[in-house]
């Protein structure tokens, strides 16, 4: 951004060229600006071809185009009216060659629409299941390239259609149509937001977690430690934390069972029809951790018939984090944190990167609790052993 610290560093170090973004463009809408296109050019993408395709979609979505012929407006009308009728969980399915599109759509939809108690909850990387594991609160958005279709995945989506679920199919010629899809979905999101009754271009609840995090790191700078907290359950290498209101509700639901499994069962028992379950993992995002967390989310979906989300912190704070705190109070959250096997100092500060991560997790949880969300934090001493224990416990309490 013009005038930022990064510009000052670039000029001081005599960078060959500085590309400026437009401060008026929100980050989630900036894929076709310098923020998206400069890296694309650097990696060898044919940017002219890419932007030519994007321009075709921009013209098709222009204000002079009739609504019924406007692909962005029509998609937005579908998403907005579906959300108002209760189908507010947009499940994103892509062909394997464009799988990362889901993460971009997840941020666009969640950060744009999830506010003032309303919103569309995007669901990314949830495997397609049998029709009977879903409730009636879903819209399935299937985006694929012409030559990237997964036959088995396509057959599962056909089964969902035949069972009466809402399935949108969007076919791209090839990956150079991604820019066109960026534009289509940006227009659609704005239109859907208007129908829902929110401003799609602000993110009022993102800053709340930042403030809570800064308060915690400031406390660390003064005292050399984060404020003390008391677990509600200690069970081997696992500790459970939550706020007073959630603790009281969980203790009542658990009855005399004060174990990890007892509280976990009580927490998952708070998931009702129309809710969604979100795993908020402040741990390393690697294949092994993703695999076990995916197993957990699918176990919850298949048993509870609710939408499930999986986000790794702190990155989800700037995407789905907005909807979790500002959107409808229909989420049940399980935050996962762990001790750091290795930590690094932050230059010029007393705190370490591990402390910053812990403060981000605690700060976000604090705001979830302040917003009256159903939330429980699982802290693992050993992340790998702890995840295995957590997965086994989830399977057991859902049985």
Feature-to-residue mapping (PLM):
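Active-site phosphate/pyrophosphate-binding segments
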Residues: 1-140, 146-151, 184-298, 302
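Glycine-rich, charge-decorated loop segments at or immediately adjacent to ligand/cofactor-binding or catalytic sites
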Residues: 3-15, 176-183, 311, 317-324, ...
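A generic structural motif
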Residues: 20-26, 112-127, 166-176, 303-315, ...
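Short conserved micro-motifs at the rims of enzyme active sites and ligand-binding pockets
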Residues: 103-104, 135, 151-155, 179-181, ...
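Phosphate/diphosphate-binding loops
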Residues: 146-165, 169-171, 200
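Extended C-terminal subregions enriched in glycine
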Residues: 149, 276-308, 312-318, 325, ...
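Ligand-binding clefts of soluble mixed alpha/beta catalytic domains
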Residues: 165, 175, 190, 194-200, ...
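C-terminal amphipathic alpha-helical interaction region
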Residues: 202, 207, 224-228, 266-279, ...
